[in-house]
Design a protein with these regions (language model features):
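General nucleic-acid-binding
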Residues: 1-34, 38
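…primarily DNA-binding HTH/wHTH and HhH modules…
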Residues: 94-117
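Terminal helix-turn-helix DNA-binding modules in bacterial transcription factors
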Residues: 47-83, 109-117
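Weak global preference for isoleucine
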Residues: 9-13, 29, 35, 57-60, ...
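Basic, amphipathic alpha-helical hairpins
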Residues: 10-24, 43-48, 66-75, 95
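Basic/polar phosphate-binding segments, predominantly the helix-turn-helix DNA-binding elements
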Residues: 27-55, 81-102
Length: 117
């Protein structure tokens, strides 16, 4: 397996913010890198902890959403959702599944922690 290929795919998805495309498809990545479905799946299985393509993209979206919620308090949750390729309800659902709390609950905890300092 070629870890350099996976690193390149991951870097491009992040730097070009491809994850923010609501309808990003596996085929878009396959075409961009000239690889087949099986090869992409092998890359994900080997270097992305066996995630499916949608799981992998959602994991990146969650990382970015977490960072934006933490470091950009001026952004609304709806703005953050759009920024990462979700609707606000999708972000709420995925964030709660991933972190055990909603984005609003997470942000409220940040704000109250700042008030206590």
């Amino acid at each position: 397996m070629d870890k350099d290929l996976f690193k390149t795919i991951d870097t491009i998805i992040r730097k070009e913010r491809l994850y923010a495309q609501v309808n990003l498809m596996r085929e878009d990545i396959m075409q961009r890198f000239g690889i087949g479905r099986h090869h992409l799946n092998d890359q994900l299985n080997t270097f992305a902890d066996g995630m499916s393509f949608p799981q992998y993209i959602n994991s990146i979206r969650m990382e970015v959403a977490y960072e934006l919620l933490t470091n950009h308090l001026e952004m609304t949750i709806t703005e953050i959702a759009r920024e990462v390729g979700f609707t606000a309800p999708n972000l709420r659902e995925q964030f709660k599944r991933c972190y055990g709390i909603t984005p609003a609950e997470y942000r409220a905890g940040l704000i109250s922690a700042d008030d206590e300092e």
